[in-house]
């Protein structure tokens, strides 16, 4: 479709490869791309896997468009850029239009790289496709609820220092500091070795013990906020970042019109469990792009405990919108395993495809069977949230369960 890379395999190609009965030969015909984690396999099986005596997907007769995302750099398999995810969404949407079929786009992915207010290019793109074709975008809320990766502070108060711990064996720690452009103050990074570095502007500090780089990002056409992104890497003589207590210090230099500062560390998939803020803010921990507008953001319910999972990302967004909007079972979910068999998966990544499956069934009833050909997008979100069941002990609507459980 004009992307300049990749290959397309239809159902006949995939079935022919499976019919060989030889895994090595079948992967020569259709390369496997899910990696050893089996994340994509599990997600797809929960949403639309075939039914059998042990398990099965929700919308088990649905067609599946599986998009393997491009990886960039890195000897460990690299990483996926948000632009690659946007191209994957574009491909799926174009294919649905070509086939004249409604589509549920499931995104079991999340990042902390953004202000969490719906205004990144990534979030705006996902919001904008709501008006294209008969679709709904379902997004996992992320597993950052108890991760200690977010803190909110007010520089106009007496609290002007925020401490965070860096655990052992970290190779690179990135810290995202979002402030209002209208506020005037300087930002300092204090290291365990006693250095105090002004990171208010672009700066690079290299030594035997630590390498620090800060980048100041001014307001853009997409956001009026200001970002200071800090990268902490090992010193020239070390393999890992110095572990210990680091801190961010704020020094007011002029007018403070708001004073609120939000800071995020990377998600739990990127850093160790020992790394985090000492006094974290568990709210506003829903990951991007679940913070986009006009998407169905999904939290995880712990069916064993009878309550929302402690790891499930919490709202509100940084600009005060309710997220997540809905919840589904997200602990020990049965899913297809990579290479065969069944596995148990935990996380909002595996709650979201349950909602995607339910959405597909409702869209079939409405659009395919012509009971309501407008049953997609915001209308579908409205109906699903209306008939969700409130969780006992949770605020309704609330920043943990949204409008309730399906």
Give the label of every model feature segment:
Residues 45, 56-57, 63-68, 103-108, ...:
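Structural recognition of the beta-strand scaffold that forms the well-ordered cores
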Residues 44-47, 52, 65-72, 93-101, ...:
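Hydrolase catalytic cores
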Residues 104-105, 122-153, 402-406:
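Catalytic cores of secreted or luminal carbohydrate-active enzymes
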């Amino acid at each position: 479709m004009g992307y300049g890379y990749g290959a397309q395999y239809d159902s006949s190609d995939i079935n022919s490869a499976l019919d060989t009965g030889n895994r090595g030969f079948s992967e020569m015909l259709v390369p496997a791309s899910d990696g050893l984690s089996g994340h994509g396999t599990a997600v797809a099986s929960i949403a639309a896997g075939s039914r059998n005596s042990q398990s099965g997907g929700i919308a088990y007769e649905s067609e599946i468009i599986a998009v393997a995302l491009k990886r960039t750099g890195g000897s460990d398999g690299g990483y996926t850029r948000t632009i690659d995810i946007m191209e994957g969404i574009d491909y799926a949407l174009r294919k649905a239009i070509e086939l004249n079929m409604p589509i549920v786009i499931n995104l079991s992915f999340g990042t902390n790289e953004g202000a969490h207010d719906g205004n990144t290019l990534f979030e705006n793109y996902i919001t904008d496709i709501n008006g294209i074709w008969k679709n709904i975008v379902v997004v996992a809320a992320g597993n950052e609820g108890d991760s200690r990766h977010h803190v909110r502070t007010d520089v106009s108060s007496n609290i002007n220092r925020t401490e965070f711990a860096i655990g052992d064996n970290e190779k690179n720690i990135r810290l995202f500091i979002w402030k209002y452009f209208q506020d005037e103050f300087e930002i300092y990074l204090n290291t365990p070795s006693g250095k105090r570095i002004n990171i208010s502007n672009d700066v690079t500090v290299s030594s035997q013990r630590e390498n620090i780089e800060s980048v100041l990002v001014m307001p853009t056409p997409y956001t009026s906020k200001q970002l200071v992104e800090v990268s902490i890497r090992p010193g020239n003589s070390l393999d890992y970042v110095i572990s210990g207590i680091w801190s961010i210090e704020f020094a007011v230099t002029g007018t403070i019109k708001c004073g609120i500062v939000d800071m995020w560390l990377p998600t739990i998939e990127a850093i160790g469990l020992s790394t985090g803020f000492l006094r974290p803010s568990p709210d506003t921990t829903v990951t991007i792009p679940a913070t986009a507008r006009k998407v169905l953001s999904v939290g995880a319910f712990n069916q064993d405990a009878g309550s929302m999972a402690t790891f499930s990302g919490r709202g509100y967004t940084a600009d005060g919108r309710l997220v997540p909007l809905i919840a589904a079972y997200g602990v020990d979910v049965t899913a297809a395993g990579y290479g065969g068999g069944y596995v148990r998966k935990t996380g909002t990544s595996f709650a979201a495809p349950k909602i995607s499956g339910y959405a597909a069934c409702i869209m079939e009833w409405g659009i395919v069977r012509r009971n309501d050909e407008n049953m997609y997008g915001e209308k579908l979100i409205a109906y699903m949230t209306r008939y969700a069941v409130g969780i006992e002990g949770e605020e309704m609507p609330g920043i943990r369960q949204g409008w309730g459980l399906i």
